[in-house]
Amino acid sequence: MDRLPTRVDRGSADWHGRREYNLGLADQLKEYLAAVKNGGGGKYVERHRKRGKMLPRERIAEICDPGSPFLEFSSLAANGLYDGRAHSAGIVTGIGVVHGKECLFVANDATVKGGSYYPMTVKKHIRAQDISDANNLPCIYLVDSGGAFLPMQDEVFPDIGHFGRIFRNQAVLSGKGIPQVAAVLGSCTAGGAYVPAMSDESIIVKGNGTIFLAGPPLVKAATGEEVSAEDLGGADVHTRQSGVADHFAENEEEALRMVRNVVENLNIEPKQRL
């Protein structure tokens, strides 16, 4: 193969100046990416781990085939927005390989404002579903979310491309035969509760996993009744009584293995060998 000649003078001051400038930008990008991978950082990550929970990218890595690639979308979403409090818009999305099958992941980051949805979070979630639709990819939702970020709810709910579109998309994708699989790994409150409820198969973790539209404090305020989160919407309630969830997991590791088992038994063929 012929080599393409270049007229760039690598010895010129201009070339060295441009090189240093672009290397600086590359270093800046690395710093940004390192920051977002730490989620909410500091005490929020520590508190998250004390509850026996993994970070979202760790959860995805546990589900994906060992050594397989993961293509993450929009790592820098919401960069510079919301006073810098919402790294990656509080959600990790991308394509991973599970039992040789390409799957679309949507994983809430509970270290970022409890996994609540900012306007950019909604946009990123819907974009991931659009990619699933266009490429016929099963969706895996790793749910750990308090629903909409209430101080900005006027920017989250009202429009056609806002929060409600997520649930509409789940119904449409399921109707097209694109599997919707959810693992409830933390609190799923308000809007966050609809994702596992509308999935084709859902898994919930004992202790950490809860599904309800309103948590115990709101129940007490509205009715005067005192109830624990586990009794109100825990794993036992939803697998043995309500039927909202299909599989009971003793811990997070077991839940992630169950996700792999569900995908293994999906009646779909791998798109290509990766």
Model features per residue range: what roles?
Residues M1, H16-R18, E31-Y32, H99-E102, ...:
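Short hydrophobic/aromatic-rich motifs at helix boundaries and adjacent loops
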Residues M1-L76, L213-L274:
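Amphipathic alpha-helical segments at domain termini/boundaries
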Residues Y21, Y32, Y44, Y82, ...:
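Sequence-level detector for tyrosine residue identity
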Residues G40, G84, A134-N135, V184, ...:
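Generic detector of short alpha-helix boundary/capping microenvironments
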Residues E46-V181:
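Long, structured ligand/cofactor-binding scaffold of large enzymes
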Residues V143-K271:
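Conserved catalytic cores of soluble enzyme domains
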